Curated annotation (Swiss-Prot):
UniProt protein name: Probable family 17 glucosidase SCW10
Organism: Saccharomyces cerevisiae (strain ATCC 204508 / S288c)
Keyword Secreted: yes
Keywords: Cell wall, Cell wall biogenesis/degradation, Cleavage on pair of basic residues, Glycoprotein, Glycosidase, Hydrolase, Secreted, Signal
EC nos: 3.2.1.-
Comment field (misc): Present with 10500 molecules/cell in log phase SD medium.
The keyword Transmembrane appears for this protein: no
Main location: secreted
Length: 389
């Protein structure tokens, strides 16, 4: 599908992240935007018929920051080639930091199954969800019970039975024996997007992945391996460090026998503000959640996500494909401007995303993550598209 879009320039205001006490948390940052337009064209895969339409595009310029990493954006901004129509309206958005969580901090290879009495985050299943798997590139999945403990092999298998319609499944780490459990439970045609979450344990993670692949599948089952999640957006790494992490992982993965794509995952804003990130990944893998733009209603989530794809594509000079590695809508939580959490709105948002750019997007997430804190706006637990509430 071919689209025309407008490049916009805006301002980023980041807030400090609280240090996690036991496990990694999902945190948000506020983003204030002011828009300037410039015409560009980009090709994006969607599920509607081929159409040429104008859409708005935001390129973000960081002006203040609570971290040294984020402040780098002031020297790596995206300049439009043409300026026109200055838009004076502002919008508040924030980004969702999604991460690996386990019952033991720092363990990238935990394999302890949870007890049968542990409550599973998939307890509320797809029975009452009308969202289908068709139309999306894939879905994200985390193997944790409501108390944060690891799901058993049997629990993971039960979860995966509900995900058979998705072509690709994204995992965030290697803890809880998740790679081997998902490899055993997935269908023969499904592919995995794996994650190396702990960048100080890259070789350990690669060893775990290699062992699982050799025991329960082949490297053909793996479509992508990511290194870290939102490191620049979270202020925990510079762009140069991200490049080093990706290089280290590529070398280790190549030695292990893997020849597929290796990427770093960050927010769309982090990439726009730090286009050096475009140099390291085999394609651009970014997270984008329309709920955190207070001016975007659920039914408009798809065009909003498409704009973020085009923004990143432009920031990278049109040289890298863009895949949305997280996008969705919460079913519970606080109303944030036009963004209203509810199951009906979640279904409307997912439908809109699929229609606009579904073949370029991983839906977030399979089941509610009740092991998380409520977080800002009280939405952190309730993104499960196959959960009943």
């Amino acid at each position: 599908m071919r689209f025309s879009n407008f490049l916009t320039v805006s301002a980023l205001l980041t807030g400090a992240l609280g240090a996690p006490a036991v496990r990694h948390k999902h945190e948000k940052r506020d983003v204030v935007t002011a828009t300037v337009h410039a015409q560009v064209t980009v090709v994006v895969s969607g599920n509607s018929g081929e159409t040429i339409v104008p859409v708005n595009e935001n390129a973000v310029v960081a002006t203040t920051s609570s971290t040294a990493v984020a402040s780098q954006a002031t020297t790596s901004t995206l300049e439009p080639t043409t300026s026109a129509n200055v838009v004076t309206s502002q919008q508040q958005t924030s980004t969702l930091q999604s991460s690996e969580a386990a019952s033991t901090v720092g363990s990238s290879t935990s394999s302890s199954p949870s007890s049968s009495s542990s409550t599973s985050s998939s307890a509320s299943s797809s029975a009452s969800s009308s969202i289908s798997a068709s139309g999306a590139k894939g879905i994200t999945y985390s193997p944790y019970n409501d108390d944060g403990s690891c799901k058993s092999t049997a629990q993971v298998a039960s979860d995966l039975e509900q995900l058979t319609g998705f072509d690709n499944i994204r995992l965030y780490g290697v803890d809880c024996s998740q790679v081997e459990n998902v490899l055993q439970a997935k269908t023969s045609s499904q592919k995995l997007f794996l994650g190396i979450y702990y960048v100080d344990k890259i070789q350990d993670a690669v060893d775990t992945i290699k062992s699982a692949v050799e025991s329960y599948g082949s490297w053909d089952d793996i479509t992508t391996v990511s290194v870290g999640n939102e490191l620049v957006n979270g202020g925990s790494a510079t762009t140069t460090q991200v490049g080093e992490y990706v290089s280290t992982a590529k070398s280790a993965l190549t030695s292990a026998g893997y020849t597929g794509s290796v990427v770093s995952v960050d927010t769309f804003i982090a990439v726009i503000n730090n286009p050096d990130l475009c140099n390291y990944s085999d394609y651009m893998a970014v997270n984008a959640h329309a709920y955190f733009d207070e001016n975007t209603a659920a039914q408009d989530a798809g065009p909003w996500v498409l704009e973020q794809i085009e923004r990143v594509y432009t920031a990278c000079g049109g040289k890298k494909d863009v895949v949305i590695t997280e996008t969705g809508w919460p079913s519970k939580g606080d109303t944030y401007g036009e963004a209203v959490p509810s199951k009906a709105n979640q279904e409307a948002a997912i439908s809109s995303i699929k229609s606009s750019c579904g073949s370029s997007a991983y839906l977030f997430t399979a089941f509610n993550d009740l092991w998380k804190d409520d977080g800002q706006y009280g939405v952190e637990k309730y993104w499960g598209i196959l959960s009943s509430d």
